[in-house]
Amino acid sequence: RESGNHPFGALLAGPDGEVLLRSGNTHKDDKGTGHAEMNVARAAAKAYAPEFLAECTLVTSVEPCCMCSGGTYWAGIGRVVYGMTEKRLAELTGDNPENLTMDMPCERIFDAGQRKVAVVGPVPELEDEIARAHEGFW
C-alpha cells in the first residue's frame, strides 16, 4: 500500500518448481496495464523459449483478468494457478475506478485459444488471506 500499487502478486515457477520471476502490481507507474501477471508474462516471454514456458506455471494471487489471461496465453505459459476468483475480487473492489473488473473467467479466455493452458484455482485455503490484503484498500 505504501508503494502506491495495488495488492496483487504473481510469479513464474519453472517445471521443477523453482521461482524464476516475480512481480507485484505496478499501477503507480503503469496505470491500468501494470498488472502483476502481465509484468511476469512480458518478462517471461523475453527471457525464456516458448518450449520451456509451456512447462512453466504462472502463480497469482487473484484469477487473471482478460488482459492478463491473454498475456499469459501469448507468452506461451502452460499453466496458471490462482488463489482467489475475480468474482470475489469484484465483491471487494466494488465500482472503484482503479479496478473495474470484468465477469470473464480466465478459463473462457484460454478455451478460446488454439493452445491449451491448464488452470488450477481458486485455492480455498488461501482465499480469505488474499481477500484480507484487499479489505480497506479499495
Name each region found by the language model:
Residues 6, 52-54, 76:
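Short loop/turn motifs at secondary-structure junctions
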Residues 8-17:
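Short beta-strand scaffold segments in enzyme catalytic cores
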Residues 1-3, 71-138:
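Zinc-dependent deaminase
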Residues 33-71:
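Short HxH-centered metal-ligating active-site micro-motif
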Residues 20-27:
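Short beta->alpha transition motifs characteristic of CBS
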Residues 8, 54-56, 117:
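Residue-level recognition of the N-termini of beta-strands and the immediately preceding loop/turn
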Residues 14, 31-37, 122:
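A structural motif shared across PLP-dependent enzymes of the aminotransferase-like
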